[in-house]
From Swiss-Prot:
It comes from Paraburkholderia phymatum (strain DSM 17167 / CIP 108236 / LMG 21445 / STM815) (Burkholderia phymatum). The gene is acpS. This is Holo-[acyl-carrier-protein] synthase. The keyword Cytoplasm applies. The lineage of its organism: Bacteria, Pseudomonadati, Pseudomonadota, Betaproteobacteria, Burkholderiales. GO terms for cellular component: cytoplasm. Its cofactor is Mg(2+).
Length: 135
């Protein structure tokens, strides 16, 4: 595999909390995909802090992914077109849908992601890869 691009992002959890308060919770619906939103609601129901940490990490991954593929938050990269889900082992994985999935497939781009959060911050790192074209 060849590296297509890398991206990293750090989010202050208190800023996400402030945006959630300012938007009466609509921020989560704006940025999370349907599977992410279900997990967010389940975690938030158990603990507001866990819900905010989940939202902050997923927001961070979307930002890092957009940097890794070189588009920023421009078409076809949209908030809800990329979800960070977990494999049964717990390993996070980026799952694209719609036009973003098509754009990535046309270029043979796959990704690897890592994310972490602490009380005050959420951080993520994404590597976008393409098949090695060397002979």
């Amino acid at each position: 595999m060849a590296i297509y691009g890398i991206g990293t992002d750090i989010v202050q959890v208190s800023r996400v909390a402030a945006v959630m308060q300012r938007t009466n919770g609509r921020f989560a619906e704006k940025v999370l995909g349907p599977d992410e939103l279900r997990v967010y609601h389940a975690r938030h129901a158990r603990s507001q802090a866990r819900g905010l940490a989940f939202l902050a990490t997923r927001f961070s991954v979307k930002e890092a992914f957009s940097k890794a593929i070189g588009l920023g938050m421009r078409w076809p990269m949209t908030w809800r077109a990329l979800q960070t889900l977990n494999e049964p082992s717990g390993r996070p994985t980026c799952v694209a849908s719609g036009e973003l999935a098509d754009w990535l497939a046309e270029r043979g781009i796959t990704s690897r992601v890592t994310l972490s959060d602490e009380r005050d911050y959420a951080v993520s790192f994404v590597i976008a890869e393409t098949p090695d074209t060397a002979d």
